[in-house]
Amino acid sequence: MRLAGFLMMAAAIPGLAEVSYVKDVQPIFNKVGCTSGPCHGGAKGKNGFKMSLRGYDPEFDFRAVMTDLSGRRINRTEPAQSLILLKPTMEIPHGGGVRLEQNSPYYKTILQWLSEGAAYGDPVSSQVTKLDVDPPEFFAQKPGPSQQLKVVAHYADGSSRDVTGLALYNSSIPTTAEISEDGVIKTLRKGEAAMLVRYEGRLSVINVTALSDKQGFQWKPVPEFNYIDTLVNEKMQRLHLLPSELTTDAEFLRRVSLDLTGLPPTPEEVRAFLNDKTENRKKRTAMIDKLMARPEFVNHWSVKWGDLLQVNRTKLGDKGMWAFRDWIREALAENKPYDKMVRELVTAKGSTFQNPPANFLRFTKEPKLAMETTTQLFLGVRMVCAQCHDHPFEKWTQNQYFSLAAFFAGVGTKPGSDSEEEIVFEKRDGAEVTHPKDGRVMTAKFLFGSEKSGVHEVGLRESLAEWLTSKDNPFFAQAMANRMWSYFFGHGIIDPVDDIRASNPPSNPKLLAALTKDFSDSNFDLKHLIRTIVSSRTYQLGFKPNEWNADDELNFSKALPRRLSAEELFDGVNIAAGTKVQLKELPEESKAQDFPDPHVGQGGFLDVFGRPERQTSCECERRSDVSLVQALNLLNGSTIADAIADSRGRVSKLLLGGKTDRQIVEELYLSSLNRMPETAELDYAQTYLGRGGSRAERAQDLLWALLNSNGFLFNR
């Protein structure tokens, strides 16, 4: 029976009262967990009873309650004997256990609804338009205090009511602050957490902060190099955090060299930088500019873009892979505006050889995949959850999912003259995306910002690209600013960087807003964004904690050590050891950052240390974890062992050059850790080299130890 039939039946019942399914009963089922994934909201439901996940489709759930089992879940004659009351109260066996207590407010509401005729209600007037939560934030001077939230839902008909007991609550960091089913926040330790409050498709986020109970905090003003420092310091002062000391010159040079070029500084560069008596900030700024002008800057960032754009010969063929990779390098070398890069990718047509951006559409041929990749990569929004149902933690709906996918409905591909070549073209007929529920053809529509359908005289993808890259699009500049920040600090201001949503708030909203505006105002200049970040004092802070920031990992009060990427480790080992890598398809002395795709050096050191296969555009595909296999590879793997023992390598040259023990120790420290050894380190290493036996083996042992140290393996 159609929903309209139920509404007519309910309307015919004399004395139809105020309680309705859509406004009163569905929220109860959501609250007690009936519509959760492990229960009846799962893909196949539970024990023959299927409901929509988290109640995103109340009409479906109403039909399931009313008609499944031939309507036996409700008892119109004796409402209290209805299965939907007997099972959750465990009056008869129920796999989900007790979900309702007899005579509880929830029980009484459902019983009243049944007694009054089980009306569905008016879905329009019952729609929640706004959710107010009081207080809007909670700030505790020390761990321990609690706070009861009050949640008020506002409806389309202008009414409102207290739904504190029906709202759903989650804490982003339960170890910092937890929240009860009734909306009571309890602070547990120093830190910050976001409380997520959900009710009938609406979500609100409450920020909770608990200061340390430690006494004696006093803010110490520090220099501010740009607006980043101002906004980071502002929050640190509020949270009773003190920043770590500034990096030493050697620490800064190693960090910024790796971050900008993917390569460590040479011993000669380290010595020159340490001996440069120019004013510190001016000297560092000059080094930043010098590094960004090097070809290695392009090589390094080409690796990152190659990951995101899935430059992989398995998907693109050899010629397509090389063409796409070269286009990326050229775009970075000329500092092509980011919005222009994205427009070229999204609107590409023609040969994947002659017009390399067309390769972007080659691995995203299906409209849904093209849309998901585009939104996740360029907006930081994961639409995939809205494919089967409305997004449970965001405003995106299933209708929006398929309307956005419709922009790519006309994309077609056909073979080119070469066996690996493909031609991307626009289909003339039959280009449509249909809704899986009812089969209706979806009209292309933007997610937000315009009432227009998106159909434009310049074409669907051109219209999408125009909307996507607009300065009025709040996600476009923000997503890249946040992603870029993560490359230098180990995590984004919003993290994961490609999962931007209301329920995943930024750790520093003002900072992210300022970065976003600056990037947009610069006309999406990627080099400007990078230079601004690394020129900040915040970026140049040391990794050693103080008593006030020891447990801080969110507010950028200190540098967080980051394990070198696979390519950085591989190149770092060979540079430290003075060895050269030769591969058939690459020029002599190429580095790992020159490798065009994961097939070069496949199955070896690079893959062990997390090089991605480039099967997705998710940052998560590149692993930065530390594993036992990696530890064993470092200890006795062939990559390090062969590099250290190379007869043409650094150790051999130092010995053949007649260097003293001190000179050997200093050179090995400079080439691996990119700093001079401390006095104790120098004394110990010289003693070790002078113990007798094979001096070559002892020098190799020293280099091996340095390459296995955290000072080499991490960028800190």
What are these regions (language model features)?
Residues 30-53, 112, 116-123, 382-397, ...:
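Periplasmic/extracellular electron-transfer cofactor-ligation site
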Residues 1-9:
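Sec-dependent signal peptide recognition
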Residues 577, 584-586, 591-596, 604-628, ...:
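Long, His/Glu/Asp-enriched segments that create or flank divalent metal/ion-associated functional microenvironments
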Residues 16-107, 124-152, 160-225, 254-255, ...:
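Solvent-exposed helix-loop boundary motif
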Residues 220-296, 304-584, 620-621, 641-699, ...:
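Primarily short, surface-exposed interaction patches in extracytoplasmic proteins
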Residues 71, 95-100, 315, 559-560, ...:
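Active-site rim elements
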Residues 100-120, 629-636, 640, 644-645:
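Catalytic cores of secreted or luminal carbohydrate-active enzymes
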